[in-house]
Amino acid sequence: MDFGLLPPEVNSSRMYSGPGPESMLAAAAAWDGVAAELTSAAVSYGSVVSTLIVEPWMGPAAAAMAAAATPYVGWLAATAALAKETATQARAAAEAFGTAFAMTVPPSLVAANRSRLMSLVAANILGQNSAAIAATQAEYAEMWAQDAAVMYSYEGASAAASALPPFTPPVQGTGPAGPAAAAAATQAAGAGAVADAQATLAQLPPGILSDILSALAANADPLTSGLLGIASTLNPQVGSAQPIVIPTPIGELDVIALYIASIATGSIALAITNTARPWHIGLYGNAGGLGPTQGHPLSSATDEPEPHWGPFGGAAPVSAGVGHAALVGALSVPHSWTTAAPEIQLAVQATPTFSSSAGADPTALNGMPAGLLSGMALASLAARGTTGGGGTRSGTSTDGQEDGRKPPVVVIREQPPPGNPPR
């Protein structure tokens, strides 16, 4: 625009009727805030990346992450500098407006000059006001020139303030096909894991898990049923499973039964106890040897109840519960408050090492020797002392106690030396 063609009334009116520099100052403050936030983000981002790849994370993955993240840190810093420059330029534009506003002739002076000129012209009958009229016109010309110069200068300053380098978008750190590739890799990894699990189960001997499934199927809760279904799906040979046993001095130990007992009970000690209960220890006639007598109850001087054999031919069916307290009326109490104390008759140390020449005392639990399973008879009653046992007691209960409320303690006596009467 050619401001020299416009009279001072127009230029001065435009300058004085505008919104002023307040909007430019507000924009400068906003850009300062953006620059500060970007600078803080760049410093924090760079610190996190450098700390992550230097201290806890090293290797090709860390190098790839650093290569993808470092350009973004640079972009944040560069954008922060651009925002700061934008704020400076907005502030410069506001200053340019202030300078132009101060140099512009006020519209009131222009109006006064025009009013005085009209008065002089109206009173100039004989030409006596010619000099005053010329001076007024000269003053008006100066106003015209001053406003034009101010507007030209303001135009140049505004153009310089608005010249900003363009903002660039951030560098693309990932490829467009990255999410699809990640999803495909995850799906492939899951399929590979399932295939590996199926291959591992297929290498097991045929029917290795049949005892587990048949034992748990009878009293399976919803969780156990779900696990059985998963096992059957992963390995179709489960249905024809055969037990795996380990030879021991007292017979063959079922590994699967031991595993089930160890994971199905809340105590490892009770798990081992309940697993070993089917292998009773006794004498084979006069041979003096030890061997399993599975399926026969212990012989003891006490009236031992017939056990309630579980699905393995050993421990009672396993059951477990979580979050259920014992009740005394309507009051929830710890389980130890309701445990009936066993009726202690006699308890001594285990018998010494068995000698083939020693006769078996009929009250000594078939002459069970000290050793790995010497105290297993007492330990097998640990669960019965707290849960009431899995079987029923033969005979009539005494002292008005119900069956299973106070299970007796098995009596273990020392084996007397040869020739001495039993104690």
Swiss-Prot record:
InterPro entries recorded: PPE_C, PPE_dom, PPE_sf
Region feature (Disordered): 383-423
One Pfam assignment: PPE-SVP
SUPFAM superfamilies for the chain: PE/PPE dimer-like
Transmembrane annotation, as ranges: none
Domain of life: Bacteria
Record GO biological process: response to host immune response
Family per record: Belongs to the mycobacterial PPE family.
Name used for this protein in its record: Uncharacterized PPE family protein PPE14
Annotated organism of origin: Mycobacterium tuberculosis (strain CDC 1551 / Oshkosh)
